[in-house]
């Protein structure tokens, strides 16, 4: 994430927090990102320097007025005018980080060899919340490289309980033994 994205995303969060709109703006940013991912040609069009800025902002206005809060629309127009609309995902990420910090939320990703059952996911979620004392936003991923067990990534901190990690530790221990 660039410094520009941090600055813009943080500024939007500050504005939303002043008005008590943090959750609404977060949801709308997510929706706009999804729309732009589904329509990459539209993003290219909005980022084309040969089209006057006023026209590009007008396109945003036509597409989103009444669909998103005015703060989100104006934010997108500012990014469009500055030629930094491609920074939207970084701005949204910076916004989410500030939102999570303010609301006591930790993002966690559980990576396993097979999909977790709903019961396992619920149990893991509850355990992480009790250990951290924070609300957990848990995402799960499947990675065939994981032989067994689970690897957790909690905001950059990795907890590796996979069979691979245990085998590697055993290998290191055996190699360290001198006969």
What are these regions (language model features)?
Residues 1-179:
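Elongated, mostly alpha-helical coiled-coil "stalk/stator" tethers of large membrane protein machines
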